[in-house]
Amino acid sequence: MNPPSWVLDTNVIVSGVLNPHGYPGRLVDAIIAGTLRLTLDDRILTEYREVWARSKFSISRAQLEAIFSLFLNQDLVTPPPLTTDLPDPDDLPFLEAAQLATDKTFVTGNAKHFPKARRRGATILSPAQAWQKLCSRRPPPEGS
């Protein structure tokens, strides 16, 4: 079974790298393990880079490069533009990319930024919901 490819909001990626013990951290671990892939476009990559470059994270250049090497072998897409109003227009690239993700799945800690009527069929999940969905896709261990 091929791993799903989902869009992860910047807040989920950052939280997962900084705190590997929560659900965002488990999702980042799944990306590293290859049991989850990222769907992203150049605008999302740019946002990831800009956020990580902020001094408040105190991350070394080597750590930053290790994080970004992870993103290079994911599912880079060029989604068609959507016409929908979101509370934060900067969130639109994530919703657009989600249209091309497995099950149109977008994982965010800010679901309120994506009102149901404006999601264009995308499934918005919290990190905990995403982890549960990912675990339900996995085959049971051999011998069980």
Write out the residue ranges for each language-model feature:
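Residue-level detector of structured alpha->beta connecting loops
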Residues: 35, 72, 102-103
